[in-house]
Structures are given as structure tokens and as C-alpha cells.
């Protein structure tokens, strides 16, 4: 699939390091929560970004591509391919979302969709500090929300993983998690210890080049699962036997410790 041109209609400053880019395209992207698009920043790179709304991406400035994206203004354009990937599957009628930082991008629309179809939603959201809190209104509109900040400037002091102690993990029909991989791995280990890893879904980030399962750059050990096509959402049991939390591969294919 060749990229289509998408004009940036609006830019929302969510936090000092996170922006939402609303895109104007000829047709709605119609992605399901958890799917992603390949975003081409002309002259820089093409990178995967999760849909945070039907026609929007929410991005944290972390590297060359996102830094270039942050320099664009309303009226500028980017290239878009997709949506790709499997996305979340809503299971049962009482779900838990566990969000770390900009892991909110795929989880907030999941909570909204679940709420619309009558599913009870509880969210545990972790941020570094008060000024990094975002999508709070979306989470609260979906259901119950508990917030933690690393420095205690908002909500409970501590990491989002600390909040797991405050809920009965076994009461939920499905648990969904997205955030930094170290945080997700700690969550996965906690779910495994509680005996509910098989009732969980995680959105994994890897180096993705083609987006259609051909190049193999995003394959995970040991099963060879392609994050771009088989994921980015995987169940907890699958991830327990994978490389998650241990290492990932860079653009050259070399292992990099998480």
C-alpha cells in the first residue's frame, strides 16, 4: 500500500512532550482500537504510530522522526499507510486497563468503545509527573480511574504497577496493558503470579519497517511472530515465552537489552 497524503488539521498539546495530531484524509481510517498506521515524515523516516482517535495520532517526542513531526504545523502534511495490525479484542463485561505514559494512545479509545457497548471499565494510569497527565477526561468518561505519578505530584505516589495491589485482578474478564516495555513486563509478571496472564492482552512496540509482515524486521523470538501483522497486541501467555522484557532488535537486527 502506498502512503496517502494526510493534512494536519489540528495539533493539540496534551503535555510538554506529547501532542495529538488530528488528520484530514480523503476517507476515514476506520481503525479499531489498538491498530496503528505507518506515518511518513517526508525527508526523515516512516514510523508506526497508534491511532488514538479515528483520524488522529498521539505522539511523544522521543527520537528523530517524532522531533521532526513536532516541528510541523497545522496545514502541513504527512504520508499515511494503514491501518495495520490486529488491535484489541473486548472480552467479557468487566475489564481493566493498565496504562503507562503514552500507552494511553491505544487504551483510551478501547475504554470508550467498551463503555459504548455496556462493558464496565476500570483504568489504572501511571505518569511521571502531574504535567504529563493526559486523557484523564477520556478515562473518567469510560469508567473508574485511579492515577499514580512517580513523584506524587498528582494522584497516588508510585508506579502504575504499585496500583495493582489495590485491585482484585481475578475479578476482571480481561486485562489490557500498554506502556514502556519494562513496565509492561512487570505487569505481566504480576498477572502471571496471580494466575491471570491468560486473561490479558498487551500492545508491544518493536522496530517496524514494512507493516505488512514481509520484511521480518519485527519478528519476535522464539516463535517468529510478526509484531506488525500478528500483533501489535498479544496475549499474556504468548509473551511469557517470548523475548518481551529481555531484548528487542534495532534497525540492523542487532539485539538491544530492554
Swiss-Prot record:
Instruction: Tell me yes or no: is Flavoprotein among this UniProt entry's keywords.
Output: yes
- Describe the location of the FAD-binding FR-type domain by residue ranges: 1-90
Identify the cofactor(s): [2Fe-2S] cluster; FAD
- Which Gene3D superfamilies does the UniProt entry name for this protein? Dihydroorotate dehydrogenase, electron transfer subunit, Nucleotide-binding domain of ferredoxin-NADP reductase (FNR) module, Translation factors
State the Gene Ontology terms under molecular function.
2 iron, 2 sulfur cluster binding; electron transfer activity; flavin adenine dinucleotide binding; metal ion binding; oxidoreductase activity
- Keyword Transport in annotation: yes
Q: In which pathway does it act?
A: Pyrimidine metabolism; UMP biosynthesis via de novo pathway; orotate from (S)-dihydroorotate (NAD(+) route): step 1/1
This protein's source sits in the domain of life called Archaea
Cofactor, how bound (note): Binds 1 [2Fe-2S] cluster per subunit. Binds 1 FAD per subunit.
Keywords assigned by UniProt?
2Fe-2S, Electron transport, FAD, Flavoprotein, Iron, Iron-sulfur, Metal-binding, Pyrimidine biosynthesis, Transport
Any one of the GO BP annotations: 'de novo' UMP biosynthetic process
Give the InterPro entries listed for this entry. Cyt_c3_hydrogenase_gsu, Dihydroorotate_DH_ele_sf, Dihydroorotate_DH_Fe-S-bd, Dihydroorotate_DHASE_ETsu, FAD-bd_FR_type, FNR_nucleotide-bd, OxRdtase_FAD/NAD-bd, PyrK_electron_transfer
* Residues annotated to bind [2Fe-2S] cluster: 210, 215, 218, 228
Assembly behavior? Heterotetramer of 2 PyrK and 2 PyrD type B subunits.
Q: NCBIfam families, per this entry?
A: PRK00054.1-1
Task performed by this protein: Responsible for channeling the electrons from the oxidation of dihydroorotate from the FMN redox center in the PyrD type B subunit to the ultimate electron acceptor NAD(+).
Task: Return the similarity comment.
Answer: Belongs to the PyrK family.
UniProt-recorded name of the protein:
Probable dihydroorotate dehydrogenase B (NAD(+)), electron transfer subunit
Q: What organism is listed for this UniProt entry?
A: Methanocella arvoryzae (strain DSM 22066 / NBRC 105507 / MRE50)
Q: Which gene encodes it?
A: pyrK
